[in-house]
Amino acid sequence: MSLKAIAFDWGHTLMDERRDEHIPLDIRPVHLMPGVADVLPQLPLPLALWANTRVARETEVRDWLGRAELGLLFQWVITSVDAGARKPAPEFFRYALAHCGLAKGNVLFVGNQLNTDIAGGEAFGIRTVWLSGFAFHSFDDHPCIARPTYTIDTLYGLPALIHKLQD
């Protein structure tokens, strides 16, 4: 199936959560992960944000995206609070696809967590991209974790991968 959208995890994929974790999202300083501001605007497909959040709903996440000057880039924002389930649960991915109006084969999901982003996406039948340069786990740590469809070290590798997939 043809690629129609790219979905991203939030923490440590787009936003550096290692800093200021204790500060509420609405006043938290914006710290983007490397490549976000350079790469996302040049991607040729609609973008979605699929995030595990503790309390934040779509409106709070959209406010943060606006402060990060990324708000206009995201057509869809899905939070686990709104979905009523957290990644890797299939209910999260079912809700995200339905809300975005996408089929499993039409989306590419980019994340840094093997145990939530990649395992959940792969189990649900979604193509995944593991952002390995900022990952908390490796295959050496957890050999039974699902393997991603694709692996890139940083977001700077994503445009070439998208181009390859669209050829």
Model region roles, listed by residue range:
Residues 1-10, 16-17, 28-167:
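Asp-based, Mg2+/Mn2+-dependent phosphohydrolase catalytic module
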Residues 21-26:
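Conserved phosphoryl-transfer catalytic core
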